């Protein structure tokens, strides 16, 4: 659903097809807004129109076929082969509209032995190794706090659709795009994935810390947590001299360079933990900012949503809602010519 929402934010007229009677499954996920919608549903479906069609009937399939001449793109997330059984596969719809852009989203490679397996974000996070690199080393593997695989797959799908539309403008040809949650989940592992290939085994989990930059992570000041990201040796020099006022630390050869700090993190870490705990958080943030060292307060979600930074940036908008009157939605995170899209 996020793919369609991204395209809708860009101005596409998106028609969401839902099951008669019950609608989309996510209408029952999360806190309820009225009788038929939830926060989960609304977070992925703004700016869309919605219709209900029984795709199990010939009449329902005819309705979809009748819409094709006025459509540029079809996005579907049936299990592999499901759309074809209904008469809604790429080749079947291409026969009606030859220049159609058709995007199939499934759990796994459509040509592999797992093609017909259902794909859920949590399962993919486990199977793609994402849970294995998340959390503390002393704790079990941990899933992300949000449906990261679902969201990234939606974003990649939107990119692919836009690229296909651009190609069609030049060539007049449609395209079949295939997206698999597993493929996108593996992509998210990024440099951790490449590290694992070089090591021949899983890299260590570091929780809020960084595998190769020290100090970099969450620390507890006297009155609350903050994030400190010392990205290079010059910053560490300022951190020691100007922030915690301990020049002896940076003058110690064990900590003079980032390579040495990473090597000796088990010695440096407890020292910094004890030091930082003796300062008020605001004082640390002031000194860190003055020294040009990346830092920030660890905020609660509600605190972040209602902050002046969020308000000033226009990151939350209110949209009219037929039941609630108005409802909050996230604004698209980009600006075009200095303006957020409505």
Where are these regions (language model features)?
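Conserved Rossmann-fold dehydrogenase catalytic segment
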Residues: 110, 138-147, 169-185, 204-211, ...
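Conserved PLP cofactor-binding pocket of PLP-dependent enzymes
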Residues: 289-313
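Short Gly/Pro-enriched turn/cap motifs at secondary-structure boundaries
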Residues: 32, 41, 206-211, 216-218, ...
């Amino acid at each position: 659903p996020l793919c369609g929402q991204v395209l809708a934010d860009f101005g596409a007229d998106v028609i969401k097809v839902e099951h008669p009677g019950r609608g989309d499954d996510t209408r029952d996920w999360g806190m309820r807004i009225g009788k038929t919608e939830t926060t989960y549903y609304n977070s992925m479906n703004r700016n869309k129109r919605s219709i209900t069609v029984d795709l199990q009937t010939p009449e329902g399939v005819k309705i979809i076929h009748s819409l094709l001449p006025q459509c540029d793109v079809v996005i579907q997330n049936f299990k592999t082969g499901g759309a074809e059984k209904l008469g809604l596969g790429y080749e079947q719809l291409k026969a009606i509209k030859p220049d159609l852009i058709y995007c199939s989203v499934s759990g796994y490679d459509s040509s592999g032995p797992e093609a017909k397996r259902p794909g859920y974000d949590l399962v993919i996070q486990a199977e793609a190794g994402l849970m294995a690199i998340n959390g503390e080393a002393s704790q079990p593997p941990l899933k992300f706090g949000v449906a990261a695989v679902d969201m990234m797959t939606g974003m990649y799908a939107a990119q692919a659709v836009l690229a296909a539309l651009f190609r069609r403008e030049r060539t007049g040809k449609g395209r079949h795009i295939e997206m698999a949650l597993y493929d996108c989940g593996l992509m998210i592992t990024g440099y951790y994935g490449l590290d694992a290939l070089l090591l021949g085994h899983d890299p260590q989990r570091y929780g809020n810390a960084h595998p190769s930059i020290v100090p970099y992570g969450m620390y507890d000041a006297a009155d609350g947590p903050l994030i400190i990201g010392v990205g290079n040796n010059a910053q560490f020099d300022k951190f020691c001299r100007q922030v915690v006022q301990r020049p002896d630390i940076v003058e110690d050869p064990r900590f003079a360079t980032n390579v040495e700090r990473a090597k000796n993190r088990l010695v440096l870490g407890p020292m910094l933990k004890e030091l930082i705990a003796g300062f008020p958080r605001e004082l640390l943030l002031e000194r860190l900012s003055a020294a040009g060292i990346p830092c920030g307060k660890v905020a609660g979600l509600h605190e972040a949503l209602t902050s002046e930074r969020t308000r000033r940036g226009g990151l939350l908008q209110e949209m009219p809602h037929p039941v609630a009157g108005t409802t909050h939605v996230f604004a698209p995170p980009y600006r075009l010519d200095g303006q957020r899209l409505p």
